[in-house]
Design a protein with these regions (language model features):
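Cytosolic regulatory/linker segments at or just downstream of nucleotide-handling modules
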Residues: 215-260
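Alpha-helix/helix-capping structural signal
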Residues: 98, 182-183, 204, 223
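Short, surface-exposed loop/helix-turn segments at secondary-structure junctions
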Residues: 188-200
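Juxtamembrane segments at transmembrane-helix boundaries
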Residues: 1-9
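Regulatory cytosolic signal-relay segments
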Residues: 12-88
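Residues that scaffold the ATP/ADP-binding catalytic core of kinase and kinase-like folds
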Residues: 103, 145, 186-188, 227-228
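Alpha-helical scaffold within the catalytic cores of cyclic-nucleotide enzymes
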Residues: 114-132, 143-176, 180-181, 201-214, ...
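Catalytic NTP-binding/metal-coordinating core of nucleotidyl cyclase/transferase enzymes
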Residues: 79-154
Length: 260
């Protein structure tokens, strides 16, 4: 463009050797070449930065989903109120592996971790289509939080049947417990370290029911039976002593469940 504006004589413009004989023209050519290289490099850097930013965003999303759970993460994007401490009604399901401690003492740490990871993966795959609020893994214990008791019961039946089949090769079994009622829910922790969790007597009772289950039983509370209105199939009611409870607690071994 500079050549066109400075020289209207086309024959002169066409004579490039003469044009570039001028030191000023040589300087301009060098500057324009360097400018083009700089712009090209800048565009490449911007493109690389965008790719790296997308990769970082994906990693952060995965890390957040691992910590919070994908369901909570998706809700938080729309409404951060989900993180606030609040009292809500939830159905809590616990499972743990019977004889896990004794079994793990005979195994290498690597074998124990590999077995647990496979166990967790199995549980996740089995319940992937069942809506749940939160899943928490603690050693051989699985806690799942549901907003709907039907989901909790359905997940319990599926997990009990299939995870016990998976654990047969280790000569292990799982037992579980379900209780429902009010919990305190939200982000719990210090300024720098927080965790989305649920707390309260409902959670403790579900855990105690799980601990009291025999073999591969899933024990449910009288509150569960009353709320589900005939959907649950159980064997005979019995009373157990739960840690922290003054009176015997009525429990029902859940055999099947039919949600409407």
């Amino acid at each position: 463009m500079y050549m066109l504006f400075e020289n209207e004589d086309r024959s002169f413009i066409a004579n490039l050797p003469i044009f570039f004989h001028d030191p000023a023209h040589q300087f301009l050519a060098i500057v324009l070449t360097l400018l083009g290289l700089l712009l090209g490099f800048s565009a490449a850097q911007n493109s690389l930065a965008r790719i790296q930013l997308k990769q970082l965003a994906l990693k952060l999303k995965n890390y957040s989903a691992w910590s919070l759970g994908e369901n909570i993460l998706n809700q938080a994007v729309e409404d951060e109120e989900i993180f606030k401490i609040k009292r809500v009604d939830r159905a809590i399901l616990f499972f743990d592996i019977r004889g896990f401690t004794k079994w793990s003492e005979k195994e290498s740490p690597e074998n124990v971790v590999n077995m647990l990871n496979d166990y967790y993966i199995q549980a996740e795959v089995l319940t992937k289509d069942i809506p749940k609020l939160k899943v928490k893994y603690t050693a051989d214990e699985i806690m799942v939080v549901f907003t709907n008791v039907d989901y909790a019961a359905k997940a319990a039946i599926i997990m009990r049947d299939h995870l016990n089949q998976y654990l047969e090769k280790y000569q292990l079994k799982i037992g579980g417990g379900i209780h429902l009622g009010p919990v305190v829910e939200g982000l719990i922790g210090s300024d720098k370290h927080k965790l989305f969790d649920v707390m309260g007597d409902t959670v403790n009772t579900a855990k105690r029911l799980c601990e009291s289950a025999k073999g591969s039983e899933v024990l449910v509370s009288i509150e569960f039976i009353e709320l589900t209105e005939g959907k649950a199939f159980t064997t005979e009611c019995r009373e157990v002593i739960l840690k922290g409870k003054e009176k015997p607690f009525q429990v029902f071994p859940l055999t099947n469940y039919f949600a409407s």
